[in-house]
């Protein structure tokens, strides 16, 4: 079943030329218990098929290297000091790093005993889970530092990674040959990357759509290098086996919101919002024209009788913006609809006289 699954996966990914490291772990490694040397063989088999293994950002995956490199994750006291130096952090983070520094690292034998206690269950299982999790809190910090600067605070990344660590503790089975740090790495990375997908953007995009966007952007970047120009949706769709309309939809979803407070110019004294026209609020020119038109209209209406003026104002909504029916106006003046129609026709005829209409023609 495993070999069949690997062949099926390679067949599925070969047209794209790339495979996500997380996807390989979810669909093959974790599912079939592939670890250590067998995991290296799996990565090699996929790469030998001409498929590049990348992370979610399209960069060569560090996980496609020797698995032992993950097991040798730098989580020593020296490495913790390096994190403090290289990652922009504030006092709460320093306090947290100092706190987890109190928990000692454990040996492979101790790890095995804790795992056995977890499997055995009972009162000792919860204590063993706590010990195993605390001993690997540094691993979470070391992994989280790779994702700093991607839209989430460092402490938030650590928190999400800790949730992945707890899931790894619950699911860990040492009888399958995993070293815990290797096994936990996948769960920690998955928790962090999913959190970034969910929370880093102003407008949340579902995880499956984030993966689609990443694939599309990688193909778009490759085509740009090959063609020397921006590829069309049709060209991108051909590479991804996706309809051009779907490509356009994904590209639209992928757009990042831009703040109206974004500084413009070298002096930073102007903002993007200053240059965007408000098509809802009336412009000064339109406002001035409307006031002048109102004044001219009032002067012209003053040449009519009071009844004629009031009928036109009601019929055309000149005062309240609401046009009234002949019946409504007739009730107001206690006459028939026909009489109102006659008064309206007579008033309009008067307004069409050149002497009255000339002042209004400039506004037409």
UniProtKB/Swiss-Prot annotation:
The keyword Cytoplasm applies. Keywords: Cytoplasm, DNA-binding, Sigma factor, Transcription, Transcription regulation. Its main location: cytoplasm. A motif (Interaction with polymerase core subunit RpoC) lies at residues 156-159. Residues 326-345 bind DNA. It comes from the Bacteria. Residues 132-202 are annotated as: Sigma-70 factor domain-2. One of its GO terms (molecular function) is sigma factor activity. One of its GO terms (biological process) is DNA-templated transcription initiation. One of its GO terms (cellular component) is cytoplasm. Residues 300-353 are annotated as: Sigma-70 factor domain-4. It is found in: Cytoplasm. Belongs to the sigma-70 factor family. RpoD/SigA subfamily. Interacts transiently with the RNA polymerase catalytic core. NCBIfam families: PRK09210.1, RpoD_Cterm, sigma70-ECF. Sigma factors are initiation factors that promote the attachment of RNA polymerase to specific initiation sites and are then released. This sigma factor is the primary sigma factor during exponential growth. This is RNA polymerase sigma factor SigA. It comes from Lactococcus lactis subsp. cremoris.
